[in-house]
From Swiss-Prot:
It comes from Escherichia coli. GO terms for molecular function: DNA binding; DNA-directed DNA polymerase activity. It holds the Pfam family Rep3_N. This is Replication protein RepA. InterPro entries: Initiator_Rep_WH1. GO terms for biological process: DNA replication initiation. Keywords: DNA replication, DNA-binding, Plasmid. Signal peptide: none annotated. RepA is essential for origin function, autoregulates its own synthesis from the promoter, and, when overproduced, blocks origin function.
Length: 286
């Protein structure tokens, strides 16, 4: 299997690599699979701990490595990744590779540029932020993806969202290394363009941020979205009643900022979100 670079995927559907990437200070490209699975979730009220194991077999089955090696059991394991820090850091990682990883899967850039790409304000460029990013890169590194063939594991491959994350404050340098086998997740049919407007309009509102990334990754005219499915996506650890309250509040926040036009309908004991329209640029209805 030949090594690939993120440019091979992001540029595969355009005529010239001179065309500006859609990954910039206002947009990020993200794999649909990661946005629909409970990979980046709200921070729990108690200790983070480990996330529940996520079955990604269906979502990752289209990857070349899964097809070529016959992997039929794919799991995502590791630490819980939150929206307020870890997703921001992940956005910075994708920005960095889209800009500097056109011919290499190991890249370097200034810590200041990376922090800005993550969305952290320049006034926070201090020792506390360096520690925050250091710990976040560690969690991304430890978020494992395990491919297995057969119940008795006749073959397997272990990787993660990030292979290496290293930085030197004295040199103002950050180094990142990614697994090229995962770039395929960014193919046109499997990626979503997320605009930062909604994330910026929802500071510290992690449930609303997570639901935004989920709903934005859905196709046009999506089917009614059950609260049970949203609870699964958010991976909250509170009682079901409290989770439903959090979901309703988050939906209202998405409506308030002008992103979502929807209604909530109850069928039996289950509630459903009916999406009427989405506006990533947050234009409030007149």
């Amino acid at each position: 299997m030949n090594q690939s670079f993120i440019s091979d995927i992001l540029y595969a559907d355009i005529e010239s690599k001179a065309k500006e990437l859609t990954v910039n200070s206002n947009n990020t490209v993200q794999p649909v699979a990661l946005m629909r699975l409970g990979v980046f979730v709200p921070k729990p009220s108690k200790s983070k701990g480990e996330s529940k194991e996520i079955d990604a077999t269906k979502a990752f089955s289209q990857l070349e490595i899964a097809k070529a090696e016959g992997y039929d059991d794919i799991k995502i394991t590791g630490p819980r990744l939150d929206m307020d820090t870890d997703f921001k850091t992940w956005i910075g990682v994708i920005y960095a590779f889209s800009k500097y990883g056109l011919s290499s899967n190991t890249i370097q850039l200034s810590f200041q540029e990376f922090a800005k790409a993550c969305g952290f304000p320049s006034k926070r460029l201090d020792a506390k932020l360096r520690l925050t990013i250091h710990e976040s890169l560690g969690r991304l590194r430890n978020k494992g993806i395990a491919f297995k063939r057969g119940k008795d594991a006749k073959g397997g491959y272990q990787t993660g969202l990030l292979k290496v994350g290293r930085f030197d404050a004295d040199l103002d340098l950050i180094e990142l290394e990614a697994d090229s086998k995962l770039w395929e997740l960014f193919q046109l049919d499997y990626r979503v363009l997320l605009q930062h407007h909604a994330l910026r309009a929802l500071p510290k509102k992690e449930a609303a941020q997570a639901i935004y990334t989920f709903i934005e990754s859905l196709p046009q005219n999506p089917l009614p979205l059950s609260f049970a499915r949203i609870r699964e996506r958010l991976a909250l650890q509170s009682a079901v009643g409290e989770q439903n309250r959090i979901i309703k509040k988050a939906i209202e926040q998405l409506k308030t900022i002008g992103y979502l036009d929807c209604s909530i309908e109850k069928k039996g004991r289950e509630s459903f979100v009916i999406v009427h329209s989405r506006n990533p640029k947050l234009k409030l209805p007149e």
